Amino acid sequence: MNKRRWIAVGVACGLLLLSIIVALIPGKDKEEASNTTLTGINKIFYGSNEITEETLEEGASNKKIVKLSVNGVIADTGESNLFSREQYNHQNFLTQLKKIQEDKAVKGVLLEVNSPGGGIYESAEIAKEMAKIKKLDIPIYTAFKNTAASGGYYISAGSDKIFATEETTTGSIGVIISGLNYSGLLEKLGVTDATYKSGALKDMMSPQHKPSEEENKVIQEFVMSAYDRFVNVVAKGRNMDTNAVKELADGRIYDGNQAVENGLVDQIGYSEDALDSLKKEKKLTDATVIEYKNDTTGFASSWLGNKIAEWQGLKATTSDRVISVFEKLGFSDTPKPMYYYGGL
């Protein structure tokens, strides 16, 4: 019998034992006992999902540099990090930022960014927590990898120092709301929109009618309000005049060298260069370098672990995940403003 089948037998035995235990419990206590027992079994199979520290470089215990990573679209899919297949998990990342704020041994942060951006709300949440870290006099050095555009730049603008490679794609400072309008197609098919509304603008950006001039004006003002907030974040973080930022913030992208020339990036370099600079400039050469990990057995990534998690409702199905991502990116009935590079 191969390893996979032995695991399956073990799971089956565990579930059988659970059902026997629960069956012996009377009435109203049964559901509570079932949940408690199931939680215990899940911890054995999957792990506790608690955030733990993994040491990358040994050093002084009272001096820590925390390495953080934003890798992927900045969107809150609502999934637990334990069962998430997305590269970036928003709630888990926010928890890491708060953990830094609570740890007095943390003396520096190295942030790696490889993201085209994402939701304006999620980006603002990250920027808010990063600002709290800076208020604690904890320096933040950021290293851009392949892409750090739009929301990826937004969350980094307040860093003490930003590094990028010559090949990095950054910039794309701006806001986008995207949607489809198929009113012309409906007209050709002889389909009539029958929407009843309390006000003329109640169904703004509906794909079923052509937008009016007033509607276009209102939506554009909404977009520009978010744009102004983005510009202010960059101006404050980079110590630049808002008009100077606006000249750069027409949505265009920059490579690393262009970003340095325009004051959006401080220095050409990789993650290790940013870390070396942080250590030397902030007198942290003897610091311990750590990153946060979630306690997991790895069972959640297996076929069997996936299926059991879906059966318990702990993990979204593949179709649910696809729908969730599309909704977060605005591919739903309600278009959303995004700090996002690459269109929608």
Swiss-Prot record:
It is an enzyme of class 3 (hydrolase). It is found in: Cell membrane. Its EC number is 3.4.21.-. The active site is at S150 (nucleophile), K202 (proton donor/acceptor). It holds the Pfam family Peptidase_S49. InterPro entries: ClpP/crotonase-like_dom_sf, Pept_S49_SppA, Peptidase_S49, S49_SppA_C. GO terms for molecular function: serine-type peptidase activity. GO terms for cellular component: plasma membrane. The chain crosses the membrane at residues 6-26. GO terms for biological process: proteolysis. Keywords: Cell membrane, Hydrolase, Membrane, Protease, Serine protease, Transmembrane, Transmembrane helix. It is a single-pass membrane protein. Digestion of the cleaved signal peptides. Belongs to the peptidase S49 family. This is Putative signal peptide peptidase SppA.
